[in-house]
Amino acid sequence: MEAAQAFENLANLEQEFGKAEIEILKKQNELFQPLFEQRRDILKTINNFWVVVLEAAGDEISQYITPEDSVLLEKLENIYVERFNEKEPRDVRISLTFQPNEYLQDDNLTLVKEVRIKEEKAKDDEGLEKKITKYTSQPVDIHWKPGKSLFRKNKKLPPNFFDYFQWTGEEEDDDFDGATLTIFLAEDLFPNAVKYFTEAMTEEASDEDESVDLEEDEEEEDEEDEEGDEEKQEPPSKKSKKSN
């Protein structure tokens, strides 16, 4: 009985921790949002910033991206995340803005996905009541150009990046893990975008330096080989005849 009470007390305490984390997130959002707005204005001056960031994100993003997706994502101009609900700061609005392209109608270059937190009560294996947190959303109506829709046409095919905009989180057979992608975009990729970009640029510069060093080494080896060949080809000097 004492053990059961202890587990119940721990469960209640975990709920209090959860409430505290939400209060921290509220304060963090209050402080960060003006800074993110300033950053957005600065990033407009850096070509392909978000394209580089997505490439640097690795499997967290690339697992969803098909070759066709990547063609459109090359036109990505901006990603922005807003926590629009003061009472529930985990609710997010994720916006992706594109340059004019062959896929999207010109009146629909910004795709907006709102994701909300939904808490439901359930019981665990021991019969104790607990709260389950779900991420839910509404499908986004994307205006594709004729014949250019990137939504998968068959549910048997693996999901791709743009299927995220059709994900709802409500269907039990939904095979797209939109909750995980939402958390990654909102809590990792967006706030740490400059870090991803800087690391990618540093790695690229390092690769270029290594390439230059390798080319210089090859040039030096070629020069040494040429000098060696010249020495081998040089004829021996003739001895002068003695006069009688």
UniProtKB/Swiss-Prot annotation:
Pfam families: NAP
Primary location group: nucleus
Keyword Disulfide bond: no
Residue numbers bearing the Phosphoserine modification: 211
InterPro entries in UniProt: NAP-like_sf (IPR037231), NAP_family (IPR002164)
SUPFAM superfamilies on file: NAP-like
GO biological process: CENP-A eviction from euchromatin; nucleosome assembly
GO cellular component, one term: chromosome, centromeric region
Region (Disordered): 199-244
Keyword match Cell membrane: no
A molecular function GO annotation: histone chaperone activity
Acidic residues biased stretches: 201-232
Keywords on record: Nucleus, Phosphoprotein
Cellular compartment(s): Nucleus
Family to which the UniProt record says this protein belongs: Belongs to the nucleosome assembly protein (NAP) family.
Entries under PANTHER family matching the protein: TESTIS-SPECIFIC Y-ENCODED PROTEIN
Protein name per its UniProtKB record: Putative nucleosome assembly protein C36B7.08c
